[in-house]
């Protein structure tokens, strides 16, 4: 089994990527610049959705780098930063089992050094206007900043992210294009439980019974997608989705969005919307142990 090299600082991860490139270049008689690096950024507590990204990265690259970093700047004050699930030991085993080359495991002080008076952030301005951005002020500034930093550190050929976080996908594609970062952003299909519930580290907050209840989210979205032509206008469509979801008294819908899959902005003036638009939502599930925020998306 391939050794997983764990790097907990920036200098080390850069050195290890460089060493791997030289090694592969010599072994396979390839030019250094031809060596492809696949990168999967995560916040840890890995599940089969994350692993599917790593497996695809392995198929398409010479070197696979995964990062685990619970990024504090993308959490608001009332969110779950302090309680976000973590199991580095198990994550490392999973990554080793699928043949990951390098694991970048920085601390907040490494990514946001306080002693230097850290004050630089990346803002994709359009993301403040999307529904998820309005619902979580400052979230996308945190996402854009950490992803930019990770890309500058790892300089990957390809970056792999899951479609479930649709607005993050749009944000990252925009920043890579606008900042002329030489990385391909590859969006991978959402991985779901057999029940339809989208895989998420936050599902660990829910009991088995609550996860079954949460699986109704995807089923309701699919049902409305299949019946969209029976509605005459956008607002009645959204209202009915909200109404059906909130038949479960433990669900409180934050928003239902019909948006462009390119900009993330709401499609107001066309219904039914163009093919491949995003139908997404966020809701609060008032579960027994804690309030849990769930998101999901399907492509229309």
Curated annotation (Swiss-Prot):
<feature type="binding site">
    <location>
        <position position="74"/>
    </location>
    <ligand>
        <name>beta-alanine</name>
    </ligand>
</feature>
<comment type="pathway">
    <text>Cofactor biosynthesis; (R)-pantothenate biosynthesis; (R)-pantothenate from (R)-pantoate and beta-alanine: step 1/1.</text>
</comment>
<dbReference type="Pfam" id="PF02569">
    <property type="entry name" value="Pantoate_ligase"/>
</dbReference>
<dbReference type="InterPro" id="IPR003721">
    <property type="entry name" value="Pantoate_ligase"/>
</dbReference>
<feature type="active site" description="Proton donor">
    <location>
        <position position="50"/>
    </location>
</feature>
<feature type="binding site">
    <location>
        <begin position="162"/>
        <end position="165"/>
    </location>
    <ligand>
        <name>ATP</name>
    </ligand>
</feature>
<feature type="binding site">
    <location>
        <position position="168"/>
    </location>
    <ligand>
        <name>(R)-pantoate</name>
    </ligand>
</feature>
<dbReference type="GO" id="GO:0004592">
    <property type="term" value="F:pantoate-beta-alanine ligase activity"/>
</dbReference>
<feature type="binding site">
    <location>
        <begin position="199"/>
        <end position="202"/>
    </location>
    <ligand>
        <name>ATP</name>
    </ligand>
</feature>
<dbReference type="InterPro" id="IPR042176">
    <property type="entry name" value="Pantoate_ligase_C"/>
</dbReference>
<keyword id="KW-0436">Ligase</keyword>
<dbReference type="InterPro" id="IPR004821">
    <property type="entry name" value="Cyt_trans-like"/>
</dbReference>
<keyword id="KW-0963">Cytoplasm</keyword>
<keyword id="KW-0547">Nucleotide-binding</keyword>
<comment type="function">
    <text>Catalyzes the condensation of pantoate with beta-alanine in an ATP-dependent reaction via a pantoyl-adenylate intermediate.</text>
</comment>
<feature type="binding site">
    <location>
        <begin position="43"/>
        <end position="50"/>
    </location>
    <ligand>
        <name>ATP</name>
    </ligand>
</feature>
<keyword id="KW-0067">ATP-binding</keyword>
<dbReference type="InterPro" id="IPR014729">
    <property type="entry name" value="Rossmann-like_a/b/a_fold"/>
</dbReference>
<comment type="similarity">
    <text>Belongs to the pantothenate synthetase family.</text>
</comment>
<dbReference type="GO" id="GO:0015940">
    <property type="term" value="P:pantothenate biosynthetic process"/>
</dbReference>
<comment type="subunit">
    <text>Homodimer.</text>
</comment>
<dbReference type="GO" id="GO:0005829">
    <property type="term" value="C:cytosol"/>
</dbReference>
<feature type="binding site">
    <location>
        <position position="74"/>
    </location>
    <ligand>
        <name>(R)-pantoate</name>
    </ligand>
</feature>
<protein>
    <recommendedName>
        <fullName>Pantoate--beta-alanine ligase</fullName>
        <ecNumber>6.3.2.1</ecNumber>
    </recommendedName>
</protein>
<keyword id="KW-0566">Pantothenate biosynthesis</keyword>
<feature type="binding site">
    <location>
        <position position="191"/>
    </location>
    <ligand>
        <name>ATP</name>
    </ligand>
</feature>
<dbReference type="GO" id="GO:0005524">
    <property type="term" value="F:ATP binding"/>
</dbReference>
């Amino acid at each position: 089994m391939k050794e997983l090299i764990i790097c907990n600082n920036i200098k080390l991860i850069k050195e290890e990527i460089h060493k791997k490139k030289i090694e592969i270049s010599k072994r396979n008689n390839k030019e250094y610049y031809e060596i492809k690096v696949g990168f999967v950024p995560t916040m840890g507590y890995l599940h089969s959705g994350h692993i599917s990204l790593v497996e695809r990265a392995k198929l398409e690259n010479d070197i696979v780098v995964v990062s685990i970093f619970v990024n504090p700047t993308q959490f608001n004050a009332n969110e779950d930063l302090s309680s976000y699930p973590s199991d580095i030991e198990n994550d490392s085993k999973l990554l080793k089992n699928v043949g990951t080359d390098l694991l970048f495991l920085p601390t907040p002080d490494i990514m946001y050094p306080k002693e230097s008076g850290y004050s630089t952030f990346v803002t994709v301005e359009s993301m403040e206007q999307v529904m998820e951005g309005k619902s979580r002020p400052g979230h996308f500034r945190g996402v854009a900043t950490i992803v930019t930093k990770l890309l500058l550190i790892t300089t990957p050929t390809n970056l792999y992210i899951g479609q479930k976080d649709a607005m993050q996908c749009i944000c990252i594609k925009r920043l890579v294009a606008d900042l002329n970062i030489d990385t391909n952003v590859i969006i991978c299909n959402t991985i779901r439980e057999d029940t339809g519930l989208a895989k998420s580290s936050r599902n660990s907050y829910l009991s088995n019974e609550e996860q079954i209840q949460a699986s109704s989210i995807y089923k309701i979205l699919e049902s409305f997608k299949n019946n969209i032509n029976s509605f005459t206008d956008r607002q009645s469509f959204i209202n009915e989705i909200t109404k059906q979801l909130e038949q479960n008294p433990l669900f409180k819908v934050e928003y239902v969005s019909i948006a462009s899959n390119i900009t993330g902005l709401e499609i107001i003036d066309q219904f039914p919307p163009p093919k491949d638009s995003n139908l997404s939502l966020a809701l609060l599930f008032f579960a027994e142990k804690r309030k849990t925020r769930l998101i999901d998306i399907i492509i229309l």
